[in-house]
Amino acid sequence: MCAIVLAAGEGRRLRPLTAYRPKALCPVGNVPLLDRALHRVAALGFADPDTVAVNACYLGEQVVRHVGGRARLSVEPDDPLGTSGGVARLRDWIDGRGVLVGNADAYLATPDAPPGPDIAALLAGWDGRTVRLLGRPVTGPSRPGDFGRHRFAGFSLLPWSRVRGLPVTPTELVRTVWRPAEAAGELEVVEFTGTYLDTGTPADYLAANLHAAGAGSLLDPTATVTGRHRRAVVGAGAVVHGTVERAVVWPGGVVHPGEHLVDAVRVGADLTVPATPAA
């Protein structure tokens, strides 16, 4: 088996944050999302360029530089190929293996197990023929993208038989693999009962950061914080002289004296991205 972490997307809903970094490199709890994904699959045994790959496109040079030699890199030269096309472009590297596919922007956490073991049920007892999805139970009304009473939670497991014929064109796994497998009775949903956020909007991105921080604040030891903070995440080299509450200050960010940053993300000295949860 092998693993692919999908990190090519632009993250348009997360703009203007993603004007500075690709979504995969946006920090959650002061750790880039991509590093969280790589750590999770490494704990399952996918920890070198022979067993784990990362794709890149939007601001791809940042992803390439960040990954270095930790994984096989697949740089898509034009527009992102989507989740299916991105996997297809790595077909020669996959070379007959089953593949665990994870979204870099998926934030998962459970109090019952560390990253890696928390999704190990996705691999347990797999026969190499079915398609498996990690799914959160749906407690409210169903959505068109749901799978029965479950909602996709960032990771899927694909057999080689479903990968080898994928076209290297912009398209999504939900259309090329998941729904066809569901129609054929070859889709299994493995339940995940922990926290899952796709970090696709500023509000969800803030929620993931606050979850990572727990009940208090998470302050990088290199940050300078003289102001008040409550449920805040403050990155490396940041300077906080004002008040931060339910907020994220990116590495190198500045909160000036007298400022009150609340339900927002601060980038640099003057960019404030509101992240108020939807009513």
Residue ranges of predicted features:
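Active-site regions of enzymes building and remodeling cell-envelope glycoconjugates
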Residues: 69-74, 142-149, 247
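Conserved N-terminal catalytic core of the sugar/cofactor nucleotidyltransferase
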Residues: 1-5, 13, 27-112, 268-279
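Catalytic-core segments of class I nucleotidyltransferases/pyrophosphorylases
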Residues: 98-100, 107-132, 137-213
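A generic "binding-loop/recognition-motif" signal
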Residues: 10, 21, 59, 77, ...
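Structural signal for interior beta-strand "rungs" in well-ordered beta-sheet cores
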Residues: 218-279
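Conserved beta-strand segments of alpha/beta enzyme cores
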Residues: 24, 70-72, 186-188
